[in-house]
Amino acid sequence: DSEDEGVATVSCAGGLRFGLTRPITRSKKEGMLLHLEATGLLGGHSGTDINKEHQNANLLMARMINHLFHNTDALLVDFNGGTKDNAIPRETSATLFYSDEVAAKNAENLALALSADFSSEICPYEPAFQFLVSTENGTADVISAEDGKAFITAMCLAPNGVQFRNMNLDGFTVTSLNLGIAATDETSASLVFAPRSSVATLMSALKEKLCLLAETFGFEVSMHGEYPGWSFAEVSPIRDVFVQSYKELFHDDLKIEAIHAGLECGPVSYTHLTLPTKA
């Protein structure tokens, strides 16, 4: 299966939308607000671009806030990153609360120092990246320390990116996941992932890992829109015949391709197991 002449697609990924939601409590406080924004990242599609190591804005922000949690008396006010589970988030914003100006200024300096480290790490291949930091006086409905820490720690420990490759296919991505959405509202904090795999058992293992993360940090799990993958067959007589026939007919080599995105071949191979779909 392929839309391009001279290309045979022989594997595709299955996937689903995997959500984690946790209740949070808030209380109104007056003090200093530290505004954080990660922006300018390349982003991309969580299937076709996940192997390019594009940075995830949600995870950079979680790393920043975790650093501030460990070194200052910060409380989380809000977190907003990503709009689609299957898109690598390019920008994320968050706000932290501090009781006084001295604490906020110290946190601002720490944030600026870590943002400089971020730039050193990723700017060679994320040239437009910026991390913006600012403070202001204000009143906010602040998330409790326990709830904020659970939300940020879960993000820091969550698996993300390429999880398994097929080295017989030049390192083709077999299994991955993307933290596409991380957000808080008045009563809850949510993480939404897009797991993908062309191998059903690896997908099951990935879902179990996310369920363990949810159990550890008090999240409820929801799964929607699951569709099966089409695994690559290391040995395939039908593929061998097809490659040879193409060579004889067109006097050119057929390109064999596996993709890390969904195709109709996934459901077809799943529902018609007797068909010779193991190309």
What name fits each language-model region?
Residues 56-60, 106, 205, 237, ...:
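Generic recognition of stable, solvent-exposed alpha-helical segments in well-folded globular domains
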Residues 85-93, 140-143, 231-243, 267-270:
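Short glycine/threonine-rich loop-to-helix capping motif typified by GTGT followed
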Residues 199-238:
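C-terminal structural cap/anchor segments
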Residues 63-80, 224, 232-268:
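Active-site-adjacent substrate-binding region
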Residues 271-277:
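Conserved small/polar residues in nucleotide/adenosyl-binding loops
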Residues 108, 148-152, 176, 203-214, ...:
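A general structural signal for well-ordered alpha-helical packing
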